[in-house]
């Protein structure tokens, strides 16, 4: 069953917190507290401050989310 009320956004990881939590600054300027999705955790993808990520947010609480993808940093 697919979740209906999800919002996708891209942002920059600004801070790494304990227990796999991260603070992400989205492109529209919102600060979000996020955690890593199970697929990223299973595949041991390393997320560091400064990485660009794709975040999934609930429509009910826009201050918390889940990191679903780490974007490549092409500077």
UniProtKB/Swiss-Prot annotation:
Gene Ontology CC terms: chloroplast; cytosol
Residue spans crossing the bilayer: none
Limits of the S1-like domain: 1-72
Keywords: Chloroplast, Initiation factor, Plastid, Protein biosynthesis, RNA-binding, rRNA-binding
InterPro entries: NA-bd_OB-fold (IPR012340), RNA-binding_domain_S1_IF1 (IPR006196), TIF_IF1 (IPR004368)
Pfam families associated with the record: eIF-1a (PF01176)
Localisation per UniProt entry: Plastid, Chloroplast
Keyword rRNA-binding: yes
PANTHER family: TRANSLATION INITIATION FACTOR IF-1, CHLOROPLASTIC
Full protein name: Translation initiation factor IF-1, chloroplastic
Organism field: Pinus koraiensis (Korean pine)
Gene from which the chain derives: infA
């Amino acid at each position: 069953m697919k979740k209906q009320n999800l919002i996708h956004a891209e942002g920059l990881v600004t801070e790494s917190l304990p227990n796999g939590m991260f603070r992400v600054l989205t492109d529209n300027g919102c600060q979000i507290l996020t955690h890593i999705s199970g697929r990223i955790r299973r595949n041991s993808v390393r997320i560091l401050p400064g990485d660009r990520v794709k975040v999934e947010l609930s429509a009910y609480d826009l201050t918390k989310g889940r990191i679903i993808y780490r974007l490549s940093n092409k500077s």
